[in-house]
Amino acid sequence: MQALMEMQIGASEVVQVLDTGCAVLPPESPLPMPEQSLRKGRLQVPRQRTAPLGIGLRRFYLIGGTMAMSLIATWVMLAVMWPGGINVLEGCLLVLFMFLFAWVTMSFASALAGFFCVVFGGGRKLGIDPQVPLPDLHTYTALLVPTYHEDPCRLLAGLQAIYESLAETGQLEHFDFFVLSDSRREEFGLAEEREYAALCERLGAHDRIFYRRRADNAGRKAGNIADWVRRFGGAYQQMLILDADSVMTGDTIVRLVAAMESNPDVGLIQSLPVVVGGRTLFARMQQFGACVYGPIIAYGVAWWHGAESNYWGHNAVIRTKAFADHAGLPALPGRKPFGGHVLSHDFVEAALIRRGGWATHMVPYLQGSYEEGPPTLTDLLIRDRRWCQGNLQHAKIVTAAGLHWISRMHMLIGIGHYFTAPMWGLLMLVGIAIPLVGDGIDLTAGMHFSPAHYWHGRTDGDVLWIFTFTMFVLLAPKLLAYFALLFKPYERRACGGALRVLLSILLESILAALMAPVVMYLQSRGVFEVLAGKDSGWDAQQRDDGKLSWSVLLRSYGGLSVLGVLIGALAYTVSPPLAMWMSPVVLGMAFSVPVVALTSHRLVGAVLRRWGIFLIPEETAPSKVLIRVAELRRARQP
C-alpha cells in the first residue's frame, strides 16, 4: 500500500487522504479555546456540590496532623542539640530536618487515611459502582491518543484492544478514536500511516478511527490536544486522554463517561492507572510497588483532594467544553526553562478547570485502567528530568489569580518533591561537617554507635528516638499497604500469597534504598540544571526493555560511584561509627553501576517471577484487554 497523500491546509495542518479515497478525519466542528490569563481571574464556585461531606475536617487532619507531628519531632531534635548552644551548621541541620520530616509526615498522614479507605471500602463517589450493570450512554466521547516518535505497532495494538473492548459493551457508537501524531521524523510518520491504514482495514473502522499528523507541533502534547479541541471538540461532550502506553477496558470507560453524564458540574475524572507489562527487574519492582503501595496512596490523596483533585495527563475523562473554556494554556514569559510552553500542563489544566467552576475528581477504586512504566532506572531518570523542569516551572503559575488553594497546594507539592532531593543531600553533608568543625570534639575517642557522641551533652536515647520515629514514618506506608492487602484475599493470592508479598516488600525496600542515593544525586543535579537555565528538550520515551551497555553505565554513573567512595572515605576518617550510619547512602552511590545494571536485566526479572517475587494480579490473572494487547503486539512483530 502506498503512503498517504498529503494536502496542505493553512499554515500548520496536514489533512491526509488514503489512496482508497477514505478520509482520515471527520468533518470539523470547531470549539473556541481562548488562552487563559494567569494574572486575572477568580474562583467561580468555592464549594462544589460533589465535594465529600466533612472535606474541611479531612484537610485539617492532614495539615494539622503533619504540623503537630513535625513540631514534636523538631522540639525533640532541638532539645538534643540545645546543650552548649546551636552553631550555624546545627541550625542548618535543624531547619533541614524540620522541612524533610514534615514532608514524610504528610505522606504518612495521607497514607493512613488511604489505609482505612481501602480496608473499610470508603472513598466511592460520583455514583460509580463497578458492581452494577453498565449504564446506557447518551453523549459522544472522543478517545485521544497523542503520539510522538512512538512505535506505531505497539500504539495501535493497544488502541485496537480498547476498540474491541468497547464494542463488547454494546456502546461503541458513542465513541470515536483519534490518533494525534506530533512525530517529526518522516520514518515514524510513514510507519504510523501504514499501521493506521491496516488497523482501519482490519476493523472496518474508517468512519470511527481517525488519524492526524501536525505539520507544526507547537506546544508539544498540550498544544496537540488544544489543536484537536479547536478543530473537532464541538462534536464531543467528553474526551478521554490516553498515553501511547495506556490501555483501558470498555467497562471502565463507559462507567467514567456515565459519571460525567450524571454529574453535570464535574469537569474531570481521573482514574488510577495500574502499571503493567514490565519484564526487567526494575520495571517489575516498580509495578509491584504501584500495585501494593499505590492503592493506599491514591485512596489517601483522593480522600482529601475531594472535588479539587489533580490530573495526571492520561487515563482520565474530561468535559470538552470545560476544557475548552478554561484550560487554554498561555506561554510563560521569559526564557526556557522557566519560560515558554507549560511542560507539566496536566496540573495547570486541572487547576484552571477548577478555577472555572468545575469539579475535578479521582476515582482510585475503579479498576481496568493501565499504563506501562520505564524499563530501567536510567529511563525513569530521563523522564524525571523533564518532569523536574515542568514542576519547577509551576513557580511562575502557583500565584495565578483565582486558583483554589488546594490547586496551589498540588503545585507546591510538585515543586517540593524535587527540592527534597538536594535537601536530603545537604542534610547528609551537614551531618558530616558538624563533627569536623565541632569545638573540642575528639574524633579518635570512643566508638559509640550513635551520632549523639558528636554533640556535647546529648543522649543516645533522644537521638535514637528521633531516628526510630523517622524510620517509622518513612516505612509505615509500606507496612500499612501490606496489612491492607491481607484484608483482600483475591489480591493477596494473586500477588503470590502473604509470605511472598512480604519477601517482595523486603527486597523492594532494599533495592529502593540502594537506588535512592542515585535518584537523590540526579534529581539534585536536575534541579541545579534547571535553576542554571538548562532546558530538558523533548525526546521520545523508551517503552520496550532497555539494553544498557557497560560503557553507557560507566558514563552515566561512574562519577557518582567515585563520589560515593570519597564520601565514604571522608566519613570513615571522621569516625567509623559515622561511616556505619551513612553506609546505606554511601553503598548506593558506590555500587550504582552494578545496581543499575542488575535491575535493567530481563533475565533477573524473569527468574524472580518464576520464584513468585514481585507478582501482581495482572501477571497471574490478566484481564481480557491485557491479553488481547499482548496477542496483537506479538502478531505485529516482524
Swiss-Prot record:
What EC number(s) does this enzyme carry?
A: 2.4.1.-
Report the subcellular localization. Answer: Cell inner membrane
Transmembrane spans: 60-82, 97-119, 415-437, 464-486, 499-521, 578-600
The answer on whether this UniProt entry bears the keyword Amino-acid biosynthesis reads no
The protein's annotated pathway: Glycan metabolism; osmoregulated periplasmic glucan (OPG) biosynthesis
Q: What CDD domains does its record include? A: Glucan_BSP_MdoH (cd04191)
Keywords, A to Z? Cell inner membrane, Cell membrane, Glycosyltransferase, Membrane, Transferase, Transmembrane, Transmembrane helix
What Gene Ontology molecular function terms does this protein carry? hexosyltransferase activity
Recorded hits in InterPro entries, A to Z, give: Glucans_biosynth_gluTrFase_H (IPR023725), Glyco_trans_2-like (IPR001173), Glycosyltr_2/OpgH_subfam (IPR050321), Nucleotide-diphossugar_trans (IPR029044)
**What domain of life does the native source organism fall in?**
Bacteria
One of its GO biological process terms is: glucan biosynthetic process
Q: How does it sit in the membrane?
A: Multi-pass membrane protein
CC per GO annotation: plasma membrane
Task: Enumerate the NCBIfam families for this protein.
Answer: PRK05454.1-4, PRK05454.2-1, PRK05454.2-5
The free-text function statement in the UniProt record for this protein reads: Involved in the biosynthesis of osmoregulated periplasmic glucans (OPGs).
Which family is this protein grouped under? Belongs to the glycosyltransferase 2 family. OpgH subfamily.
Protein name per Swiss-Prot or TrEMBL: Glucans biosynthesis glucosyltransferase H
Source organism? Xylella fastidiosa (strain 9a5c)
Q: Which gene encodes it?
A: opgH
